[in-house]
Regions:
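N-terminal glycine/threonine-rich, aromatic-flanked beta-hairpin/loop signature
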Residues: 53-107, 175-267
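Amphipathic hydrophobic-ligand
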Residues: 50-60, 102-111, 130-136, 237-242, ...
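Short, exposed beta-strand/loop patches in secreted or surface proteins that constitute
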Residues: 58-66, 111-116, 137-140, 213-218, ...
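Polybasic, proline/glycine-rich intrinsically disordered low-complexity segments
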Residues: 114-153
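Bacterial Sec-dependent N-terminal signal peptides
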Residues: 1-6, 10, 14-41, 137-160, ...
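Mixed-charge, low-complexity intrinsically disordered segments
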Residues: 83-97, 170-208, 256-355
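Tryptophan-anchored aromatic micro-motifs
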Residues: 30-57, 152-203, 362-365
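Short, hydrophobic/aromatic-rich segments at coil-to-beta transitions
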Residues: 32-42, 67-72, 116-125, 159-161, ...
Length: 366
């Protein structure tokens, strides 16, 4: 009997030992889920690259439940701290609108497969949607996220480098598109449309060609310009990527401006820039989320890209600012300043009675 009790006791101890070992093994094999739920990253907590260059003004929300798969949400966010030294008043209201990471996508969401590496996750892959392809790679932990995306947008007829169209006074061809028709009886300048065309051909075109050399529409949706800041032919600078992007939709070109990137560039040169620059840029905030719609006509190696009155007239109120008028008139030859000032003086009435207004660029494929 004692032997039987001893045997049973021994078996119970052995079973308890193996059960404990089994529990320990299961405990060791269950890796805790990092960042369970949603975690948002922006500003200094986010290192985002579009192509090979940093992309500012964006926010990313990362979420996972099992630590094996996750969801990433990318969108734009406007950081008011970047313009604190540029705004003329601390009471300025800063709009919270911004374009997304990928041109034409206010919000981009995609799923990722996660690999745990210590206290962080790594992920990489390809996401295709809306005719574009995005390759991505990144890491995320409890304090920060790094993400690099390389995007190839759908092919379009604007891809490549374009020069400003050459000016031809005999045919009226000009790099600048500017036509303006108003029915106002109070116009004292003969023929508003003719005056606008004259302004474009004689003043704006020569000024523009001094500063702007070429415009390149890239496969990733970036727009890059070569220019001369001093207006010298032998001086050539290239604008940074991720300042301006574009996409084509329903026959229109949508221009997206990255306000954070632009204002960061302004802030880097703020000794040369008035506070007015930032406030003017902010007037475009209502168009930032989806982009500024522009007409785009391409034929035989030429392109006409222009805004019409539906877009321009609400923005022309900016020209009522005395500071802006002074800046523009200062660039006009002294002998023509009186005529240009007369146009600005009549601007409010012109806006009310305008039936046609087109402004933009004529380009030729390089």
């Amino acid at each position: 009997m004692k032997k039987n009790l001893l045997f049973v006791f021994t078996m119970l101890c052995a079973l308890s030992f193996f059960t404990a070992c089994s529990d320990d093994d299961n405990s060791d094999s269950e890796v805790p889920v990092l960042l369970k739920g949603e975690t948002a990253f922006s500003a200094e907590k986010l290192s985002l690259k579009y192509g090979d260059s940093p992309l500012l003004g964006k926010a990313i929300t990362f979420s996972t439940e099992d630590g094996k798969t996750g969801t990433i949400k990318m969108e734009g966010v406007f950081d008011p701290s970047i313009i604190k030294d540029l705004l003329p008043s601390k009471n300025n209201v800063v709009p919270a609108l911004a374009p997304g990471v990928i041109p034409g996508e206010v919000v981009t969401m995609f799923n990722v497969n996660l690999t745990q590496d210590g206290n962080k996750y790594t992920f990489e892959g390809t996401d295709s949607n809306n005719g574009r392809e995005m390759k991505y790679a990144g890491t995320v932990d409890s304090t920060s996220m790094t993400l690099a995306v390389n995007v190839t947008m759908p092919k379009n007829d604007l891809l490549g480098t374009w020069n400003l169209a050459k000016q031809d006074m005999t045919t009226g061809k000009s790099p600048v598109i500017l036509s303006w028709i108003s029915t106002s009886p109070g116009i004292t300048i003969p023929g508003t449309k003719d005056a606008a065309a004259l302004l474009g051909n004689i003043f704006l075109s020569p000024m523009l060609t001094k500063y702007l050399h070429t415009v390149t529409f890239q496969e990733d949706g970036n727009i890059v310009a070569s220019y001369s800041a001093a207006g010298k032919e032998d001086e050539n600078s290239v604008s940074p990527v991720n300042l301006a992007q574009y996409y084509i939709k329903d026959g229109k070109l949508y221009l997206q401006l990255n306000i954070d990137m632009i204002l960061a560039t302004i802030a880097a040169n703020k000794t040369k820039t008035k506070a007015l620059d930032a406030s003017v840029i902010l007037q475009f905030a209502s168009l930032l989320s989806e982009g500024i719609p522009l007409n785009c006509e391409i034929k035989d190696g030429t392109a006409a890209i222009y805004a019409d009155k539906d877009l321009i007239l609400p923005l022309l109120s900016l020209l009522s600012s005395e500071e802006i008028v002074e800046l523009i008139i200062a660039q006009v030859p002294a002998g023509q300043q009186e005529m240009v000032k007369a146009i600005f003086d009549q601007l409010p009435e012109l806006i009310k009675t305008t039936t046609e207004f087109n402004a933009g660029l004529n380009l030729e494929k390089e």
